[in-house]
Amino acid sequence: MIDRSGEVERRCHIATREVIAVALTFILHLGGCGGSATPPSATEPPTPPPPETEPLVSAFVAFVGVDVLPMDSEILLVDQTVIVKDRRIQTVDLRSNVALPQDAVQVDGTGLVLMPGLADMHVHLLEEDLPAYLAYGITTVRNMWGHAAVSDMDALIRNGALRGPFIYSTSPGIDGPPAKWPVTQLVESPAEATATVARLVGEGWTMLKVYQDLRPDVYQAVVEAARAHDVPFVGHVPHRVGLREVLLSGQASLEHLGGYDVALGGARGTAGWLQMDAGKIPEAVTWTWESGAYVCPTLAVFKEIAATSSAEDASVIAGNRRTFVKALHEGYVPLLVGTDSGIDLVAPGSSLHEELREFVEAGLPPYVTLAAATITPARFLGEEEEFGAVREGLRADLLLLTGNPLTDISVLSDPAGIMVNGDWYSGDALETLSRRSGNF
């Protein structure tokens, strides 16, 4: 979640969905939410989808005569057959080399392109949004504020009882006072920070989120405890710590380009981006590259925030942020595509395609843009043997497209079919999923 510093709080009345009240949304300002990471639960657990949304489930599915964009390299493999068996990619080879299993369900791939499913690397997940992610080809998400309902959804998705993208989640956010969001892990001293990290790791969180109001000594205690427990920490640049110190700390990812506003423009938020000093960009890029951190810019949602400024200022702010993202790419900093969806400023699912367009408009090459939503997230999460590419042995999370996204990225938003964990959505099943998503 972005620190909007008063710029869009007046918009927050739009967050009226019932789920927000019972499943931890991130619009409501609640105080005193420190303590246990277990939030109030919804009255009912996540439920499987109704029968009409069921995808085709088969032990064998064969995509025949399809062109493959594997995404672990910048090539297009033509006239391939891709066989999926038991939810894994079993075969990727020339059609002429492959004998089809007799019981395989065949999908004619002639004139179509198969690529990995997409990853949204910054979401705030609600069960009601699961169909939207799938309908837009998003088969993996990184949830950026953990709570019990997310853990429940993850377990149901992984055992096939609930349809949705695979979830990788951070812990609830660790922050200093005042607590801003539900289940904030409020820490006010190094000792509290050390104990909180130990408790969160004991609860099973494998990635920690830091937030914006940690004091420098408390942030350092979180860093040391995370290292001691061998868990990565990600999130915001705390205001009193600053960009340089966060990069030196080993924070694995930085969200929203936070901290760069101050480093480049001398002020937080839109004011910093409005007065960005381009002469400071090379140093900030070098710091970032040397740190090994990944950056998740969330350009599209920040455009919504900047829209509260004048049209001229909003254009400058968006342009400066795109300029900096291009500089990060040119400086070999790995980028992640993320949206901040789930807070009602951008729509789940469709906003990822807006973010991809922002990357392209920033001047990033199409392959780099696509990689930031496929193979790069897999590398960041250490899951290259699970997802992010069309390769034998990986999870069968796939998009079937009517064209080549390397030449026309818009084809991503209207897939011919979607496979998530081996379940195939096309035709009526895809149409039903699309209707349920609420974004069509």
Please name every model-derived segment.
Residues 30-32:
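C-terminal motif of bacterial Sec signal peptides marking the signal peptidase cleavage site
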Residues 34-37:
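Bacterial signal peptide processing site
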Residues 48, 52-59, 68, 73-115:
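Histidine-rich, glycine-flanked metal-binding segment
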Residues 51-54, 68-81, 94-95, 347, ...:
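Acidic, glycine-enriched loop/beta-strand segments at the rims
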Residues 109-114, 129-238, 251-260, 265-308:
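Divalent-metal coordination cores built from histidine and acidic residues
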Residues 154, 243-251, 265-267, 301-322, ...:
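Histidine/acidic-residue-rich catalytic or RNA/ligand-binding cores of hydrolases
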Residues 316-401:
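His/Asp/Glu-enriched, well-ordered alpha-helical/loop segment
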